[in-house]
Amino acid sequence: MIRRQLINFQNRSVDVRVGLGAFDELSRMFASAVGKPKRAMVVWNDATSERFGEVVERALVDAGFAVSQLSLEVSPAGATLADADAIFGALSANGVTCDDLVIAVGDAATCSVVSWCANQWCGRTECALLPTTFDAMLTVATTMKPLVASSVNALPAIAFRPEPGLVVCDLGLVREADPEDLKLGYVVLVGTMLSSSKSRWNQFTETVPEILAGEEVALVNAVQWSQTARKD
């Protein structure tokens, strides 16, 4: 089951797809992300590229894109202005224009900096985010992890509401993750639900056992509830 959610903002909407095996449908999703597939640039780190490279590249090629890549090691604590500069340099070197597609595969920090760079490039270039951590799945459609000035100066330098066109959350990554790696996501989820309505909080508390057990419908609901609450 792959459920679709449109999160509407003032001038545009974010297309969020959530479910087990969502990455298996990437080709179809990528093909509809832009008017006419031409060029696509993927940003990820070495570990993410090794794990998802074949799936993502094949999906882009099948959708009609010529694919370029940038390997970038972004700190989970937050991307830096130097990371953003590296992305801008790669966009220029690969001839990416506002008619093309920029894709981020990784954690919240990686998705955030790529989304921001795509939004600035050529007046705005379409962006697709493939979050690979639970906390990123809960946040990247609506909330940016701030860029910091540098690895030495960790004060937030840039933050804005992200505007990706497409976010794809494959819940199989949550099911197979180490429980320790899910803790931040649980913290984000509880904090978000606490700030939501009482009825939504009650719905959430009733499904906590199913969420912890990795039950698909409960996880899909959790991601969608979180995105909706964070939008507001």
What are the functions of these language-model segments?
Residues 74-76, 109, 134:
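Residue-level detector of flexible, active-site-proximal loop/helix-junction positions
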